[in-house]
Amino acid sequence: MPICIPDELPAVNFLQNENVFVMTSTRANIQNIRPLKVLLLNLMPKKIETENQFLRLLSNTPLQVDIQLLRIDNRKCRNTPAEHLNNFYCDFEQIKHQNFDGLIVTGAPLGLVEFEDVAYWKQIERIISWAKEHVTSTLFICWAVQAALNILYGLPKFTREVKLSGVYYHSTLNPLALLTRGFDESFFAPHSRYADFPEQVVREHTDLDILSSSEDAGVYLLASKDKRMVFVTGHPEYDAGTLASEYLRDLAAGLAPKIPINYFPDNNPERKPLASWRSHGHLLFSNWLNYYVYQITPYDLTYMNPTLD
C-alpha cells in the first residue's frame, strides 16, 4: 500500500525516483475505498487445492477482496465433489452482466491438446472477450496464457518436446515496472508446462511488455501497457509439494518424467522439497491487486473505465 504524505514534501520526488509508490494528500483525500471484486475461473482438476493456493496469495494484502469462484461449465469433475461446485461456484450466465475489478484464469492440464480440441474452447473465447469490457485487469496463468495469446493476438500454439518442470531463476527486466516493484533482481519461480513462449514471437506479434524472463525457462511475466492484461507463464501459486505430486503422478502413469529441475534437495525425489518462490508469489499478487487493480479500477463498477488518472 502507498504512503500518504504532503504534496510539497521533498520526499515525494525522491521516493518516486526510487520507484516507491507515494500518494499525495490531495489524491488521498478524494480516494474512495471499497472491497475489490475478483473472479477466479478455476480450470484445474483439483479445484479445492487450486482455490487454496490462489486464495492464500490474494489474502496477503491490506485490501479486502471479495472472491467469486467461476467454473467453465456444469460438466462433472472427477476430482472435486459436485456438492462443492454447486455450493461455491457460479456459471458464466449468472455473472455475465456484472463488472469485476479483477479476473484470474488458472492453468489447465491441456498442454498437448490443440486449441480446437479443447472441449470448452468456445467458452474460453467468450469469457476472455467479455473480460475486455467487464474487468479492470485480468491475470492469466500458464496454459491460460497460451490460450489468451492466441485469442487476443493470434499467436499459434508452441509446444516443447520435453515438459518444462522445475524451479528456475528469473530476472526482472524493467526496474521501474509496477508489477515487479520490490522484486529481487533475480528470483525463483516454478514451471510445469509443455507450452512454449518464444520471446522473439512475442515481441514481433504483440505490444506486450516483457517484465521478467529466465535463461532456461524463457519468458515469464508479460503485461499490456494499459495494465488490463497480465500473463504469468509459470505457477507462483504452487505449494511446496505440487511439483512432487505431479512428478509422482506421471511416474505412476509410465510417462518417464524427468526429475523437476532445482527442486528436490540433492536432486533426490525421496527428500522433501522446500518452496523457494513463496515470497515472490505473494509480492506478485500483491502488486497486481494494488497497482493493476485497486489503483485504476473505478469506484463505481457500473462504469467500467479503468484509468491511471
Curated annotation (Swiss-Prot):
Main subcellular location: cytoplasm
EC number(s): the record gives: 2.3.1.46
Q: Where is this site: Important for acyl-CoA specificity?
A: 111
Q: Where is this site: Important for substrate specificity?
A: 192
Compartment(s) of residence: Cytoplasm
* Top EC class for this record: transferase
The similarity annotation says: Belongs to the MetA family.
| Name the UniProt record assigns to this protein | Homoserine O-succinyltransferase
- The species is Photorhabdus laumondii subsp. laumondii (strain DSM 15139 / CIP 105565 / TT01) (Photorhabdus luminescens subsp. laumondii)
Per the record, the gene is metAS
